[in-house]
Curated annotation (Swiss-Prot):
Residues 126-148 are annotated as: Disordered. One of its GO terms (cellular component) is cytosolic large ribosomal subunit. GO terms for biological process: translation. InterPro entries: Ribosomal_uL3, Ribosomal_uL3_bac/org-type, Ribosomal_uL3_CS, Transl_B-barrel_sf. Belongs to the universal ribosomal protein uL3 family. Keywords: Ribonucleoprotein, Ribosomal protein, RNA-binding, rRNA-binding. One of the primary rRNA binding proteins, it binds directly near the 3'-end of the 23S rRNA, where it nucleates assembly of the 50S subunit. GO terms for molecular function: rRNA binding; structural constituent of ribosome. This is Large ribosomal subunit protein uL3. It comes from the Bacteria.
Length: 209
């Protein structure tokens, strides 16, 4: 069954194993996760658990939001996400979800919004090769051929310069190196999408090896 939690990316560091192996890890702080609603097939057509993350001031939330969180006897939340394929019996409305739902060695998927890079060319954005830099070449970092003459247009999906980054990215099959219950922190092996302080969604891997 799926387990999930929301957190903020603190940054990256490194830890050492007992045999001296260095492991780069991403630190994710996952405090203030509260179960807001349990959805069932009878009432909603599917099963899921709705989790709210990070308190926000009541004046910043509207009446429907305040009424929704009042059923869970908690404060308005800044982020609300759903996790499907869960065991609903393990969750109680209004209960806090802590990082100990995961254990060291668990394989997870991490979802976040990638860093925005602004307007970029095809070499940086799509990894294309540049042209010759000498011998009279006047073609260096341009997109290249736009296609044949006959259609009198550029085909859809042609790789061109444009806005790069700022997209939702999921990195699969990452390993949890350490779970710190006291500080509500997860250490995940490798990098996780997003800038520092960005929202990160952690859930059980769908394609675990």
């Amino acid at each position: 069954m799926t387990k999930g939690i929301l957190g903020r990316k603190v940054g990256m560091t490194q830890v050492f194993t007992e045999n001296g192996e260095l492991i780069p890890v991403t630190v994710i702080e996952a405090a203030q996760n509260v179960v807001l609603q349990k959805k069932t097939v009878e009432t909603d057509g599917y099963e899921a658990v709705q989790i709210g993350f990070e308190d926000k001031r009541a004046k910043l939330s509207n009446k429907p939001e305040q009424g929704h969180v009042a059923k869970a006897d908690t404060t308005p939340k800044r982020f609300i996400r759903e996790f499907r394929d869960v065991n609903l019996d393990e969750y109680e409305i209004g209960a806090e979800v802590k990082v100990d739902v995961f254990a060291e060695g668990d394989i997870i998927d991490a979802t976040g919004v990638s860093k925005g890079k602004g307007f970029q060319g095809v070499i940086k954005r799509h990894g294309q090769s540049r042209g010759p830099m000498a011998h009279g070449s006047r073609y260096h970092r341009r997109p290249g051929s736009m296609g044949p003459v006959a259609p009198n247009r550029v085909f859809k999906n042609k790789l061109l310069p444009g806005r790069m980054g700022g997209e939702q990215i999921t990195i699969q099959n990452l390993e949890i190196v350490k779970v710190d219950v006291e500080k509500n922190v997860l250490l995940v092996k490798g990098n996780v999408p997003g800038a520092k302080k960005a929202l990160v969604q952690i859930k059980t891997a769908t394609k675990a090896k």
